[in-house]
Structure formats: C-alpha cells, structure tokens
Amino acid sequence: MTSHLDDEGLHPMVSTLLGGGTLPTVPFKAYTRERMMELRTTKASMTRPENLSEDFNGEDGKFSPLKWLEHRWEIEGIKNRPMSKKIDSLCAGADENTGLSPQRRAFSSGCKAPTDDKGRDGEYERLGGHGKNWRNGSTGGADKFASRGNDFKPSFQKGNQLERGTRGAEWKKDTTRGAKFAPRREERLTSLSGSEKLPEWADGPTTMDDMIELRGFDEPKKVKNKKNPKEKKEKEAVKAPEPVECVGSRPSSTGLKTSEPIDDPAIAYSSSGGGALPATDQELAALLGCLDIQKTSRKIDGDDMAWAHKSEETAGGTSRLSRFFAKKNKSPELDAMLSSVGGGNDENVANPMLARLFGHSGGDNNASSSGAGDIKGGMRLEDLEKGMESKEPSKVSPLQDPSQQAQLLQHLQKFAKQQAESGQHIHHHRQPTPPNGGPQHQQHLHHPMVHPGMQIIADPSLLASFAQNPVILNAYVENQLQEAVNAAIRANNGQQLPPQLHEQLRMASMRNKAFLQSQTLTFVSLQQQHQNIQQHQQQQQHHQHKGRTPAMIPASVQRQLQKSSSNADQKKEKTSQSPPESNQETSDAHNQSDAMNQLKKLHMQQNYANMVQAMNSGVGWARGNGVVNGQQQHPQQQLPPNVQMLMAQHQQAQMQHLKMMMSRAQQQHMLMAKIAQMQQQQAQMANMQERQGPSHNQQQHQPVVPSELSQVGPIQTPLEKLLASVGVQGSQFTGSGDRIPSSVRPMSLEDLEKQLTAVPK
C-alpha cells in the first residue's frame, strides 16, 4: 500500500520526505550585469515567442504585460483599478493645461476631493460602527459627525460653554481654547464673506512645468586657512626650476651653449634658461641699459659673491618677485650702480642711455642736459591714454627671448638718438638770422642775449624762461621724466617697468633738475655781465663815430620850442573863454593841437639831430637837412611807408576837423553879432520912449521885438528860453495879459531861428 501510495497517490516530494530522504538541491546559478547585457543582445532574446499575441503590444511595438493583465482582470470580473490606469493618469498630468490642486494632485474637472466607491457608510463602519473604538476615546469617533445636524443655531439659543467669550473677548480665543478646538463659527463667517486666508501650503506652482527653488542643498562654507597661501607659494617655488645663467654665450638652436661671445652685455647677462625673467636685479638693470655690468663686475669682491650666492639660494624657496618687496639691505650691485650713475666724480656718465633720454651727453658732467623740449618721436596724448588703459597682460611674457631684449635696447637707443637730433634741430631753428640777409657769423650760433664765451650747455631760451618763471622748470623736468617712462614702456611692449628702474629714472630726473637750476643761475649772472659789456661798448662806439655830444641846445631851437608852447597856451585860453555849449568840441580841438605840437617837436628834433650829425661829420647843412641837387626833400620821404601813411591819415582828419571848427566858429560869431544888434535896437527904442513920454505909447511905429522883453521876469516861453541860451536876458512880466502888446506882430519860432541863423551878405 505504501508503494501504491508512493506510485499513485503521493507527490514524489512527499514520498521522499516520508521515506526519510533529503530533497535534491538545485545548483544556484547567478549572472553578472555584464553577462545579462550580453544575453540581452542574443538571438534567442531578440526572438518573440509565438504565444504572445500582437493585440497586447504597447506604443513601442513590443509586448506589454500590463495590457495583458488588464485583459485578464476584465475577463475574471475584477473591478479594481489596474496599474496601467494610474500610469496613464500620471502621463496625462504632464499636459500643459493640467493644473494642480492645493494638495498637489492633478485634476482636469476642477478642484475636488476624490470620490470613494464605498460611500460614507464604509467610513462609519471603518471607525467602528455601533461598537466601541478604543482608539478614539469613549465616543468611539462619533464626535466627528455629531455636529452635522445642528450646525445652525437660532439667535435665541445660547451657545455652549466652548463658544463663550467669542463676542467681545476674541483676544482669549487663542489662549483659552486648545489647539483642537477650532473657531467653527468664525470660519463659517469668513467662508461666506470670501475673505478666507490661504494656508502656507497653498502658495506655490500651479502647473507641473513651473520651476521651484530647492533649498537646503548648499555645501557648507569652507573656512579659509591662513597657512594655505604660504604653503602654496612655497610649493610653487619648489616646483619652479632654478634659472641657469649663461654669461657671455648665446644659446644655439640645438639647446647647447656656444663659445661665440655676445657683444651686447645686456643680452649676455639677461638671457637665462627657458627664456624666463632675469634672476637678479643686476641682470634686469643691465637688460634695460641702466648698468654697465662689465664695469661693475670688477668692483665685486668676495662678500658680494657670497651675498649673490645666498640670494640665489633664497630665490628657490620664495617667489621670484618677492625681492622687489622684501625689506632688506640694498644689493652691492645696486649700490655700485647708484654710485656709478649718481657719483660726484669727474668720470663720464655710467649710463649713456639715461643720459641721452634726459638730455645728457656722454662727455659732459652728470648734470649736463641738452635741454631739448620738443622730441621728434615724442608720445602723444592718445598713446599715453592707450598705454594707461591697456591693463590686459600679453600672451607672451616680456623679455623672455634674447631677440626681444635686443629689440628693447634698440628702441631705447633709437629714442635717445631721436631726442639728440631733435635738440640740435630746435637749436638750429632758434638761431637768429641777420636783418639784412647777410651771412651769419660765429656769434650767431649762440643765444643773442648770451656772451659767446659763456659755458652754457642747455638751451639759452629755456634757461631764460626758467629765470622768468621757476614753475616752468618743474614742469619741464616732470615732462622729461614722463616721456622717458613712456619710451621705456613702449620699448617693453606696453608692460609696466620694475620699481627699481622707475626709481633710477626719477633720480636721474632730480639730478637733471639740479643741473638746470645751476645752469639758470649761471645764465642769469652771465647775461647781466654781457648786457653791461654791450652797453659800455655801445657808448664807446657812439663817442668814436659821432664825437662829443653838444652840451646845450642852440638858442634858435629853444626860441622855436618856446614859440610853439606859447601858441599852445594861447589856444587853451581861447578855448576856455568859449561858451559852455562847445566844451566837448574845444576838448577835441585841444587834443588835436597837442598832437600837432608833438609832431612839430619831433620834426624839429629830427632836423636838429641831422644838423648836429652833419656838423660833426663835416657834411654841409644842405645835405644834412635833406637837400639833394638844390632840391629839398620832404621830411616824410625819410620816414618808413607805414609812418607816412599814418601821418597822411592824421593830417586829413585834422583838416576836416579844422573845417568843421571854422564853420561852427563863424556861425557863433554871426549869432553873437545878431544878438548884439538886437540889444542895441532895444536900448535905442527904450530911450526914445522915455523922451517922448506916455502919450506916444499907442503909436504903431514900434519895432518887431517889444520893449517889454528888456525887463527882467520869469522865463516861461520857448522864445525866452532860446534867447537865454544865447546870452539874452528875458524880460519881466507883471501879468499874464500884458506880456505882449497888441501892436506886436506875431512871429513863429522857425522864422526867428531862420532870421538869427541867416548869413548877412
């Protein structure tokens, strides 16, 4: 029976367990990810089984298990929502028109809570039904639905104890009530009025495409370690290769040294391995032409070599540019360079480049200067602004190649040569030319105010301007310093100069300023001496050529001068006696007479000088006075043309003025004569009336002008004003009706003026 069971009724596994045997273990087989990826591309994996219907294909054309599962659920009558619908709804939520609910759920038909198929009864049964739920207290969760039927309370009903204090005591609602007692009545009123405040979680994006700000993902700020920059500098300095000096040799194309000597010491001492910057200050100064290394190297002793070795060792541990900012003693090379350039010995200037830039000559003293103010290749304002504004570093570091170093030296030498040529050119143009067009003598090579023997190196015109205004000297020195700095910057491809080179230029500028000051003082003293010598020579020449000057003026000349002065005094007296109306005209006449007197005096003095010269030189008076071949020349022919033209214009203006004065004087004399005649007639008529008596007052043989005008009275009529202006006194009138008698013939003002101004024939 047992065997029958084993063979027919029992499962082989059960029979094995009952038989006491062990279950056979299937060997565990695992695949790695790489192996699975390889199996994915095999032919068996790419072949679709025949039992998979094409009706369940997805959008990608492959079999979709979700569609097949949904089909099986529909057949079996399962109404649960399949997973495919959830995925489709998520995909549909990505539409642009789909909005977000306040709970961030997608909705297409408005903002509402999701419906439940089981309804409210299911919720009530879930909370415990009629039984008791110990989780929700003694009420079993029924207090949640207790207030649904009695939300509205009439006005006559009293509120419960929980709602007491809401009227007039709203300040207690947050403190007396707990967090779980919500002010339901206040919420209902605010919902009806539409002034409900949105909660915090309601603010945010309204669509799924809106961008939101993610916070809390910032990395913590790292605290800067003070030791890191120093350690970083030390590491960089250790990594930097030490420069290899190649003195007196030029690197070949194969990278090996050649024994060919270099003529230019700046290139020989500045070229280093890899084309880097010079390692020492001496090489940098030699590169820019500020130091003669061949001359300075002879002065270096054992201590200097030890210091140079020490500086090379320290340069490997720190930055190569730190030597410009380190606070230590000056190097012996720099001291030797300063002493050679600024020393007070009588040797030539050790730096001919700076001497040329600042106007020094190689064979003169340190303070010698050419004084050329204008440089032919000077820098314009636009170039200076471009040089100051260009702060971008060049792609190739400057002075890294011997050719660039030689180019820098060549630019500096060319600039110094141009400055020297421009100084000579300016000095040549400033030489005075002789007025008669004759050849220039040797004395014309110097300034006209400077003696030929004076030792003046600078331009005398500049020294004269410096003597007049010392501010020009300071401006001139600053301009030279700026031009030298700009030239060095241009030669250095626009790169900034090292501080030591800039200091060298400034010290050379100060020495140039001191030299120009001493030259200015020498120029002023020698100029005064030269002026005194010239005055003495002129006096001697005057005594030799013209003889002894007369001690007194001849009596004839004095009489003529006195006569002219007396005529002028007489004219002044006449003009002072004229009426006040012509004061302005007399002043003009006085000025004209003074001018004529001055011209007469000048002519007389010129004639007298010609006469004295003729007498001293033995020439007759006729030739000395301008008489040639029996004909006397006009004095104006001896004057320049412009003076003759001015004199002719002055004479014409004077003649016109004299004509006007004569016509006005004639008119005045005629007017005065007319008035005097009228006064005489009035006096005669008055005498006749007194003799004849009062019986003849009514006769009609009276003159045109009434006798009452002779009486003194107030001036009220235009006729009386006109008569008073010419010196006739008006008459007095006792009454307004007796002023003019009935026998007087009326006469207009125009007729009276015509009669007075009429010229008698």
Curated annotation (Swiss-Prot):
Tissues showing expression:
In the embryo, significantly enriched in the germ cell lineage.
Provide the protein's localization.
Answer: Cytoplasm
Which residue windows does the record flag with biased composition (Basic and acidic residues)? 114-128, 164-189, 212-222
Knockout or disruption consequences: Defective spindle orientation, oogenesis defects and reduced embryo production with ectopic mei-1 localization. Derepression of zif-1 in oocytes. Hermaphrodites are sterile with gonads that are normal in size but display a bulbous shape in the distal region. When grown at 20 degrees Celsius, mutants display a mildly disorganized meiotic progression and contain a mixture of oocytes in diakinesis and pachytene stages in the proximal gonad. When grown at 25 degrees Celsius, 14% of mutants show a bifurcation of the gonad shortly after the transition zone.
Predominant localisation class: cytoplasm
GO BP annotations of the record are: negative regulation of translation
Comp. bias (Polar residues)? 400-410, 557-568, 576-592, 690-702
What keywords sit in the KW lines?
A: Cytoplasm, Repressor, Translation regulation
| UniProt function note | Involved in translational repression of multiple mRNAs in the distal gonad. Recruited to the 3' untranslated region (UTR) of zif-1 by oma-1 and is required for translational repression of zif-1. May also be involved in translational repression of mei-1 through recruitment to the mei-1 3' UTR by oma-1. Required for oogenesis but not spermatogenesis, for P granule formation and for the localization of car-1 and cgh-1 to P granules. Required for normal spindle orientation in early embryos.
Q: Give the record's subunit note.
A: Interacts with cgh-1. Interacts with ife-1 and oma-1.
Protein name according to UniProt: Translational repressor ifet-1
